[in-house]
Amino acid sequence: MLQKAETAYATFKSDHKYRDRDGRDIIFGTDHVPNYHGVVYIELVKIPAILYSYTGKKEYLQEAQNGIAKMEKYDMLASGIPSSNEHFNGISEMAGHETCNLATLPYTYGYMLQVTGDATWADKIEKAVFNGGIGAVTKDFRAEQYFSAPNQFIATLNSNHLGYQNARMAFLPGHDTECCTGNVNRFMPYYIQQMWLETKNGGVAASLYGSSEINAVVGAGKVPVKIVETTKYPFEEAIAFEVQTQKTVKFPFRLRIPAWCANATVTVNGKKVDGKVIPGEFFELNRVFANGDKITLLIPMDVKVTSWPNNGVGIERGPIVYSYPIASTADTVSGDYKKATKAFPGFELTPAHDWNYSLLVNNSNDVEVVKNSNYTYPWKVGANPVRLKVPAQKLKDWKLNSYVDTASKATIYQTSPFPANRETTGDKEYIELVPYGSTLLRVTVFPKQ
């Protein structure tokens, strides 16, 4: 069976010259720039990694790694999801992504995490889920966008600027084709699936963080244990674990140290653990654990200012990308849109106040972190655990794109690119950015002054 799989993959690659553009995308080991259907590419690029896991042939793993690296180089957006309005579409402030990719990326990257043991794959999974994933749905999870984007200033039945069907950026329970409606339900289960992993040496690895419990059999004696994880991650920095076991047992317990965290610390029963805690790697506690042992991982979240094409700028803190939330007027989609119901309504959102800000930010010193401990559901719009206060100025010429539809004679409004003229209007003011995932309309990549 394995030989057949290798033969099939070799054939899969070898006849690409006789295929269309989609076929040329599958030559993952070359410098060919991916330019076809993003969902298919992300699904297929894990195949050589799976073959590596069964054969040990490093050339398979290298093909998968190269295929992903070039996709990220040319298409990865601030949301943690590659641009892909059906086809890959490059990096710009106008780029967006198909919601199917919110599921396929953590699925494929989960395989890469398991096959390689490289902690940075988990970093990428959490960024995609917490930002691009949750940012594409209403916070009650009853409506989603077919296309979503880091910058989306309007979301109506005719505002889609990414091509194909006009309504694909509206928040609806179903779209013109149902692939995204099915796939949107997968991204969070895939996150949960990768939270806890078994290690080859009889231990466990906490790879993606969130309050949870795991029952495992560990150590040379295959002793059953329960580990209880308690945290408010990704909004707070402390992650606590308690080991519950009927008898003492020695086993390796691995903790992911995110690549963005420079000063993580690990304590056991209140005492700091010696050893190098390296960003982007797993830290291993290989010791005898007793019932009630408490492990605490502290991962400080620093502010990071990111650069984007066309002199764009974004801001992150830990795994969370921050956006300016655009207050909106929500109109319920009328009953003649048959996929919207009373239980699962659809919405058109139009901006209700100004959003045309440029940022006056050079580095993290220009950003103030504002914490709020009084919250319940952290993704609720307007009730955020962490906000970032930043200096900004409005741009005179940054407005919604508009055109007159020749058939209906109606004026159509769409999200717009950065203006060529960055003349400001008004004085410097301070605006508050919130987690990307808690927004519906937003600005995530800003023009920089």
Model-derived features: positions:
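Beta-strand-rich binding/interaction modules
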Residues: T248-V268
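Long, well-ordered core segments of solenoidal/helical folds
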Residues: Q3-G23, E63-G80, K127-T138, S212
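C-terminal beta-rich recognition modules with glycine/proline-rich loops and embedded aromatic residues
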Residues: A64, D123-N131, A136-I239, I278, ...
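Catalytic cores of extracellular degradative/oxidative enzymes
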Residues: M1-N35, V39, A49, K58-E59
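Well-ordered alpha-helical segments within folded domains of soluble proteins
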Residues: M1, N35-S53, H97-L113, T181-Y191
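Carbohydrate-binding/catalytic loop surfaces
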Residues: R21-L44, S79-T104, F141-H175
